[in-house]
C-alpha cells in the first residue's frame, strides 16, 4: 500500500494546489494496467508530506494550526504522535486527526526551523504501523525588528581643510529580519546632528560637506546618525554618536611675540654660547612647527647665527666670533621667521613672512692683555750673545690701557739661557750651540699692572720660537768608523779602503771636502776622488807584519765653509797574513780604547760602599765582645740576666742584686774565679753563699749577719764607687705582714739576732729565701 503526502497550512491556498498535484501523481486509487504492477505485489506505504510552514509572531489565539499529517492506514486503528526536542513543548499533534498545532508564538529571529519526527502507531498495542518520518516546520519572517548599530559610539578623524566629499568613517546598523524576504532587512541612514558640516551616504559612509574645517577654530565635532527600517511595522529606528577629530596640517605661519628684542651680553662671551632667544607663536601642533630664522639683507650674519630649538621652536642667537666692546658696542639687525614646510594649498591671506628687530648691547669686561701676534719666531746666530734677539708686544684691550710686564715661564732648562726686559725684548745670557739645541721654545707671559705696579690678575701667554742659525764651527770627520785591513804582501796600488766625511754643521748641497795625509813617509797614499770621498791605496807594496801589525794613518779633512775648517781623523790599518787568494788568514786588530761608562762606575762605587759597611759591622761586633770580657762575663752569663716571670721573686730588680758568676761558681763547689787584672774597680756584687752545714741543734745566724754587715760597711765607706741601691719589692710586705718589712733599706748590722727559720713556714713563695737564710742541716746544695 502506498502512502499519501499532504501539506496543509491555514490561509495558504497555494499549498492546496501543490497537494492536489502530488495526490494526482501518486494516487493509490488509480487503476492498475496489466503491465504496470504485478497483481500479487504489495504496495509500500509512505508519507505524503515532509514540510510545513507558519508565520512568526501571529496575534490570533493559541494554539495556532500548522498543518496535518495523514496516513493511508485505517484511521480507526491509528494514532499520531510527534517526537523531537520541541514536541510537546512548542508543537503538539491531534492523535486522531493528525492536525499539528503551535502551542506558543514563534520568533524566527530565535529559531527559524524546527525538525520533528512523525509516528503512526496502533491505538491498542502502541506499535509502529509505519516507519518514523522526519519533517520540518519553517517559520516565515515578518518585518518586526528595527536596525541596531554595531557600536553606540564611533570615533573618527579627518585632516583639517579637507575637500568636500572626503571620507570620514563607515558606520553600520544591523536588522535581525530575514534579508531574503522583500525589504525586511533594508536600512536607511540619516544625520540628525552635524549635517551642516558632514553628510552620510546610503551605505553608511560619512563624508565632509565643508572644506573650511579649521582645527585651530574647532578641533572636535559630534555627529548623530539614525538608522531606520522603512518597511517596519512600528517605525522604530536606532541611533549612534560619531565623534570626529580634525587632524592638524601645517597651515599656519610663525609670528613673533614681540616686534623688538633687546639683549645685553659681555664682550668675553664664549663663541657658540647662547646669548638670547627669539619666541614665535605657531598654532599648529609641535610636529608641524618648523620655524626657520634668517637675517634680512645679510646683516651681521658673519658675527651671529640663529639656531632653531626643535623642542620649543624658539630661535637661539649665538656669536660665531669674539665680540669686542672697544670696536663695536651695539649690534642692530632684522630677523625674519618663516616655515619652509608649510602646505601652500591651505595658505590664505596670512603673510608667509614675519620680521622682528634685534638689538644686542655689548658690555665692557676687563680683559687680559692681547699679543700682537699669535706666536713669534726669531733667529739667532750660534756662538753669539745678543742684547736683543727680538721683541714681543702685548696691549691692554680695555679703555684703561694698563701697563704690561713680561716674564719667561721656566718650564724647562732651556729657558735659563734667555731673559726678557720690561718692554718685551728677549736676549740670551749664554752662547748657544746649534749642534746641542737647534730650537728653543719659550713661553712668554704678559701681566697687567696698575699704577702702583701691582698685578691685576689679568695675564696672557704666547709661544716664542727661537731658531739657532748654524755657522761653520765644527771640523769634518769620518762619516763612520773604519777598520781597514791589508795583506802583508799587498802589491803597490792595492786599494785598502774608501773613506768619506761628514760635518756636524749644516752641510749645504755644494759642500766639498778635501782629503790629504798629514805625513807622506808611510807605505800608504791618498787619492782624493773630488766627490767627497777618497781612496787609501798601498804606496810601495809589501808590509813587514813583525815590525808593525797596525799602522796609524792621520787623515786631514777640510771643508769649504767660511772660515774653512780642517779636522784630523786617524785611520788604523791592520796588517794581516793572507793566503795565495788574497784572503785574510790571521789578523790582530788594533786594541780598542778602554773606557768605563758612568753606569759601571756607579756599580763599582756601590760594591765598595757595601764592603765598607760590612767591615765596620764586623769590627763593631768584635769590640763589643771585648767589652763584655772586660766586665768578666761570658756570653752565656750575660744571657742569664734574662728574667723568667713564672718564678717568684722581686721582679726585674732581682737582676741587680746578685752576681751570676758567683752563683755558678758556688753551684759547682768552687770559689768565684778571680777578676782580670784590668778590672781594678771594686766589685758591686755580693758573694752570696749559704753558711756551711752545722751540726744538729747548732744555730749560727750571726755569721750571715756578720757577712751582710761587712758588705754594707764596705759599700758605705767606698768613696770611689758609685751609689748602688737596690729596692726589693715583695707581694706581701709591710706592717700587716707576719714578718713585717723585709726590705734591706732600713736594716743595719743589728739584725744578727734574727731567726730566719720561720721562712720555711711561709710556703713555696718564700722557698728561695728560706734556702738562702735558713740553716737546714739536710740541704746539700750551695748557692
UniProtKB/Swiss-Prot annotation:
One of its GO terms (cellular component) is adherens junction. Ca(2+) 1 binds at residues 56-57, 107, 109, 144. Residues 1-25 form the signal peptide. Residues 46-599 are extracellular. GO terms for biological process: adherens junction organization; calcium-dependent cell-cell adhesion via plasma membrane cell adhesion molecules; cell migration; cell morphogenesis; cell-cell adhesion mediated by cadherin; cell-cell junction assembly; endothelial cell morphogenesis; homophilic cell adhesion via plasma membrane adhesion molecules. Ca(2+) 3 binds at residues 143, 145, 175, 177, 184, 229. Residues 621-660 are annotated as: Required for interaction with PALS1. Residues 44-149, 150-256, 257-371, 372-478, 478-585 form the Cadherin domain. The keyword Metal-binding applies. Residues 26-45 form a propeptide. Ca(2+) 2 binds at residues 56, 109, 141-142, 144, 177. Keywords: Calcium, Cell adhesion, Cell junction, Cell membrane, Cleavage on pair of basic residues, Cytoplasm, Glycoprotein, Membrane, Metal-binding, Phosphoprotein, Repeat, Signal, Transmembrane, Transmembrane helix. The chain crosses the membrane at residues 600-620. Three calcium ions are usually bound at the interface of each cadherin domain and rigidify the connections, imparting a strong curvature to the full-length ectodomain. Part of a complex composed of AMOTL2, MAGI1 and CDH5, within the complex AMOTL2 acts as a scaffold protein for the interaction of MAGI1 with CDH5. The complex is required for coupling actin fibers to cell junctions in endothelial cells. Within the complex AMOTL2 (via its N-terminus) interacts with CDH5. Interacts (via cadherin 5 domain) with PTPRB. Interacts with TRPC4. Interacts with KRIT1. Interacts with PARD3. Interacts with RTN4 (isoform B). PANTHER family: CADHERIN-23, CADHERIN-5. This is Cadherin-5. It comes from Bos taurus. The lineage of its organism: Eukaryota, Metazoa, Chordata, Craniata, Vertebrata.
Amino acid at each position: 500500500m502506498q502512502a499519501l503526502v499532504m501539506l496543509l497550512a491555514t490561509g495558504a491556498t497555494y499549498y492546496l494546489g501543490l497537494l492536489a498535484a502530488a495526490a494526482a501523481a501518486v494516487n493509490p486509487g488509480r487503476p492498475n494496467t496489466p503491465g504496470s504492477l504485478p497483481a500479487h505485489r504489495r504496495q509500500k506505504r509512505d508519507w505524503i508530506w515532509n514540510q510545513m510552514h507558519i508565520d512568526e509572531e501571529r496575534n490570533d489565539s493559541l494554539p495556532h494550526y500548522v498543518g496535518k499529517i495523514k496516513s493511508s492506514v485505517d484511521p480507526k486503528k491509528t494514532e499520531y504522535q510527534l517526537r523531537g526536542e520541541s514536541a510537546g513543548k512548542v508543537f503538539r499533534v491531534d492523535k486522531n486527526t493528525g492536525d499539528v498545532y503551535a502551542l506558543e508564538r514563534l520568533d524566527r529571529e530565535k529559531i527559524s526551523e524546527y525538525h520533528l519526527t512523525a509516528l503512526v502507531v496502533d491505538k491498542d498495542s502502541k506499535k509502529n504501523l509505519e516507519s518514523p518520518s522526519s519533517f520540518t516546520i519553517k517559520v516565515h519572517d515578518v518585518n518586526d525588528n528595527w536596525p541596531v548599530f554595531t557600536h553606540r559610539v564611533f570615533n573618527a578623524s579627518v585632516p583639517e581643510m579637507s575637500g568636500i566629499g572626503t571620507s570620514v568613517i563607515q558606520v553600520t546598523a544591523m536588522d535581525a529580519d530575514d534579508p531574503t524576504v522583500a525589504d525586511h532587512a533594508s536600512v536607511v541612514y540619516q544625520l540628525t546632528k552635524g549635517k551642516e558640516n558632514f553628510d552620510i551616504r546610503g551605505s553608511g559612509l560619512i563624508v565632509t560637506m565643508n572644506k573650511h574645517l579649521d582645527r585651530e577654530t574647532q578641533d572636535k565635532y559630534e555627529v548623530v546618525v539614525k538608522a531606520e527600517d522603512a518597511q517596519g511595522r512600528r517605525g522604530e529606528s536606532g541611533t549612534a554618536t560619531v565623534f570626529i577629530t580634525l587632524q592638524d596640517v601645517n597651515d599656519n605661519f610663525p609670528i613673533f611675540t614681540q616686534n623688538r628684542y633687546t639683549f645685553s651680553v659681555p664682550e668675553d662671551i664664549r663663541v657658540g654660547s647662547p646669548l638670547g632667544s627669539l619666541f614665535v607663536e605657531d598654532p599648529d601642533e609641535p610636529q608641524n612647527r618648523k620655524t626657520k630664522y634668517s637675517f634680512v639683507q645679510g646683516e651681521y650674519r658673519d658675527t651671529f647665527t640663529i639656531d632653531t630649538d626643535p623642542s620649543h621652536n624658539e630661535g637661539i642667537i649665538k656669536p660665531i666670533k669674539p665680540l669686542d666692546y672697544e670696536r663695536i658696542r651695539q649690534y642692530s639687525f632684522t630677523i625674519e621667521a618663516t616655515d619652509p614646510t608649510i602646505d601652500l594649498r591651505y595658505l590664505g591671506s596670512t603673510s608667509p613672512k614675519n620680521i622682528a628687530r634685534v638689538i644686542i648691547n655689548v658690555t665692557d669686561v676687563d680683559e687680559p692683555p692681547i699679543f700682537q701676534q699669535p706666536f713669534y719666531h726669531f733667529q739667532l746666530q750660534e756662538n753669539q750673545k745678543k742684547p736683543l734677539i727680538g721683541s714681543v708686544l702685548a696691549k691692554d684691550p680695555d679703555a684703561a690701557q694698563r701697563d704690561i710686564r713680561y716674564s719667561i715661564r721656566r718650564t724647562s732648562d732651556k729657558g735659563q739661557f734667555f731673559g726678557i726686559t720690561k718692554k718685551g725684548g728677549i736676549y740670551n745670557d749664554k752662547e748657544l750651540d746649534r749642534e746641542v739645541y737647534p730650537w728653543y721654545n719659550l713661553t712668554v707671559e704678559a701681566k697687567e699692572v696698575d699704577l702702583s705696579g701691582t698685578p691685576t690678575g689679568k695675564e696672557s701667554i704666547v709661544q716664542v720660537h727661537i731658531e739657532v742659525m748654524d755657522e761653520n764651527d765644527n771640523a769634518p770627520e769620518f762619516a763612520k768608523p773604519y777598520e781597514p785591513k791589508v795583506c802583508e804582501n799587498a802589491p803597490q796600488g792595492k786599494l785598502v779602503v774608501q773613506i768619506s766625511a761628514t760635518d756636524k754643521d749644516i752641510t749645504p748641497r755644494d759642500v766639498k771636502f778635501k782629503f790629504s795625509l798629514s805625513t807622506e813617509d808611510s807605505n800608504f797614499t791618498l787619492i782624493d776622488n773630488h766627490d767627497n770621498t777618497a781612496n787609501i791605496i798601498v804606496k810601495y807594496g809589501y808590509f813587514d807584519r813583525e815590525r808593525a801589525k797596525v799602522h796609524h794613518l792621520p787623515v786631514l779633512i777640510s771643508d769649504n765653509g767660511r772660515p774653512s775648517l780642517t779636522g784630523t781623523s786617524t785611520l788604523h790599518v791592520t796588517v794581516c797574513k793572507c793566503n795565495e787568494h788574497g784572503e785574510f788568514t790571521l789578523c790582530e786588530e788594533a786594541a780598542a780604547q778602554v773606557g768605563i761608562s758612568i753606569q759601571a762606575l756607579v756599580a763599582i762605587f756601590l760594591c765598595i760602599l757595601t764592603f765598607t759597611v760590612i767591615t765596620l759591622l764586623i769590627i763593631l761586633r768584635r769590640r763589643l765582645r771585648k767589652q763584655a770580657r772586660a766586665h768578666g762575663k761570658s756570653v752565656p752569663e750575660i744571657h742569664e740576666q734574662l728574667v723568667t716571670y713564672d718564678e717568684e721573686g722581686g721582679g726585674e730588680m732581682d737582676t741587680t742584686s746578685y752576681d751570676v758568676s758567683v752563683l755558678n761558681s758556688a753551684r759547682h763547689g768552687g770559689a768565684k774565679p778571680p777578676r782580670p787584672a784590668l778590672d781594678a774597680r771594686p766589685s758591686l756584687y755580693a758573694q752570696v753563699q749559704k753558711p756551711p752545714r752545722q751540726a744538729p741543734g747548732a744555730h749560727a745566724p750571726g755569721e750571715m749577719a756578720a757577712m751582710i754587715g761587712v758588705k754594707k760597711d764596705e759599700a758605705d765607706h767606698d768613696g770611689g764607687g758609685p751609689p748602688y741601691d737596690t729596692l726589693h719589692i715583695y707581694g706581701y710586705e709591710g706592717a700587716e705582714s707576719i714578718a713585717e718589712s723585709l726590705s734591706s733599706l732600713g736594716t743595719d748590722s743589728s739584725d744578727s739576732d734574727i731567726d730566719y727559720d720561720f721562712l720555711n713556714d711561709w710556703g713555696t713563695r718564700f722557698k728561695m729565701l728560706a734556702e738562702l737564710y735558713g740553716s737546714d742541716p739536710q740541704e746539700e746544695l750551695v748557692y
